[in-house]
């Protein structure tokens, strides 16, 4: 942390000189009062950044911020809502991060908001304001150092920062309503500070404390954004350790997504032009979570508010230019992030692929998640998010119903963020994440399902979603499987996790990283669904991650193969995540067996993780192409099914079907994400990552298999796969898990296919048989190797054994004949057709069919008398009269 701070300080001082110049220019261009406000704002931003840095790396810096800026900032707080929005965010970040300076920074935020109008040009990077303020006023070396630290953090986490910057840029460029910007920036910064790589658990704890204080202060000081900020704060406080980082990344990604949604072109420009955005500062503090929430709201408002004022957009453009000058390097990053966000918006699953390929994709997922959160926060800002962190996630997902794909991605991002934070974050953060994960996961699945039903969910497929959980034994699985998993494998997962962590981490993390990298690229597209979320969430919470990962390795592997939700569900159901019973439901119908298998696998899996990871990696790689191809179908069906899942999560049949489809997406979706996210997590928790990788590999195999199969087949495959996976997992708990998992996936596919075909074929066969019999009779054995009914009658007329006795000519020239013994003729016809139940009525229907064909005609006024329309000339004539 200290080294990072020094590095940040070095970069921050350089930045500060540039930012100071731009800030001075901006403030000078603005009124003197605004310039003074900007100076106090910059001071507050610097103090806030320092407080963020201090909050995160060292609490020492926090005292610096509670300096004079608060009184100055208080008056101008609302002077220029659009312009001051970003500064406000910085101030809010400071508030969030600094307990003593929270109030002062709130005041400073207000002042900065006023000053922000002139500062808007600086807005290209909140860092510029903060740094320039630091350079000018340099309230204290700590503040300047803190700001650089935040900058360093930003540089360290350039992908998330890029998105955050994108978000802040869009905020600045849009200069939407002050409220929106204020909330958005606060969220951004709140998320950013946790995302700083150097944060430790102690830092996370500090951040959580700061978040709590910021929450309170925001409640008091934030006029419009107080509720939204509180919600993100509350959201972060429980998850502060893990979720702060996740939230920051998520916010960054979400901001980028929101910006892309709001203005694709503007975002591109913003990404290119403004690589220095408040993002850098926001990274410094724990307030980033709240800032990201606010930023999401502000980003949304920007979308709406771009039309609000042209001047705001102009200011934002200036800010973007300033940012361009400040950080041209981030142009590429921002363009990439922007493109990613665009891809996410348009192809929720596609972005996931990107995400799986690189940390930037994870950030994209996070961005989507944050965008969803922001959107959700805007509707729920007042009270929903304040309720609880888990609620915040849930509502975010619910609000995020905008697009199932985005929601899934966001969820995945959240999971990835949580997993990243959980790996490096404190156990508190993990616990918070675990709590949130269960809530968020069920909610996400629901939202995910709803969205997918509506859009994709997001087309992300939720095997572990509530629907997924309830897919087979919804209620028992939801309540019992997680319990079963936690109870049956609850103790073992920890031991396995410990084993994986202690013994397997290096190799596992390496193989997991390799497998995740390989599978993430291809599987990311496919596995953008719920699976990532459960895995990510469990990754988020170290405890839950380990348990979940182990479960995902054990149950999920089987369950992935059987039902994409198996890994996702079992992971959420890990001891750390008992709240995720709903998600476990998918794997629940496997749950007891899966839990047992998972437990056995956890014990042996850790040993076999490397081999499993490698094998699974190969399998995943081979399946990635298939999964990617199937992604589109899976995403579509997954989206629809996710919505169904949420609605039918408690209906086993529907749930099964949904799971079948979800497994496609979830198997595909979760694995890539689990791999991308598990890469970060795998290093901290090699064992867990191995589990996730194994589960991902199994899921990938199952997903590819399931994808091949129809949705019904997928459902059958999931059911059979869960059973087979449980059995195979238990049997192959050892190093052969990778093989078993593929087997499970293939088995699940085969079983599902057989079940589906068997059941349907039998039914279909029965139905067709009757028609065939009837049709055969009606069509006079056309399909038979013998003759048609008219040909049969003609033969009878030429056979002395039957001619005068059962049938005879009444007018040979005209082809008129009579059925002397209609019953005998019908019996003969039945014998000929091998239909002993043939009768004249049935045969008569066949004869009437020839009326239409122009072969026979009915002679009016005479029973059983028919006429050949065209009498063949080569028939053997029999003198029926003589006989």
UniProtKB/Swiss-Prot annotation:
GO terms for biological process: autophagy; cell differentiation; oogenesis; positive regulation of transcription by RNA polymerase II; regulation of development, heterochronic; regulation of transcription by RNA polymerase II; spermatogenesis. One of its GO terms (molecular function) is DNA-binding transcription factor activity, RNA polymerase II-specific. Residues 223-239 have a biased composition (Polar residues). Residues 672-688 have a biased composition (Basic residues). Residues 241-264 have a biased composition (Acidic residues). Residues 19-65, 74-83, 362-378, 407-418, 428-437, 477-491, 612-671 have a biased composition (Low complexity). Residues 96-119, 198-207 have a biased composition (Basic and acidic residues). The keyword Transferase does not apply. It is found in: Nucleus. PROSITE patterns: ETS_DOMAIN_1 (PS00345), ETS_DOMAIN_2 (PS00346), ETS_DOMAIN_3 (PS50061). Induction: The expression of this protein is developmentally regulated and is correlated with the 20-OH-ecdysone induced activity of puff 74EF. GO terms for cellular component: nucleus. Residues 19-207, 223-264, 299-321, 355-383, 407-437, 450-497, 562-587, 612-695 are annotated as: Disordered. Residues 787-869 bind DNA. InterPro entries: Ets_dom, ETS_fam, WH-like_DNA-bd_sf, WH_DNA-bd_sf. Residues 563-576 have a biased composition (Gly residues). Keywords: Developmental protein, DNA-binding, Nucleus, Transcription, Transcription regulation. Belongs to the ETS family. This is Ecdysone-induced protein 74EF isoform B. It comes from Drosophila melanogaster (Fruit fly). The gene is Eip74EF.
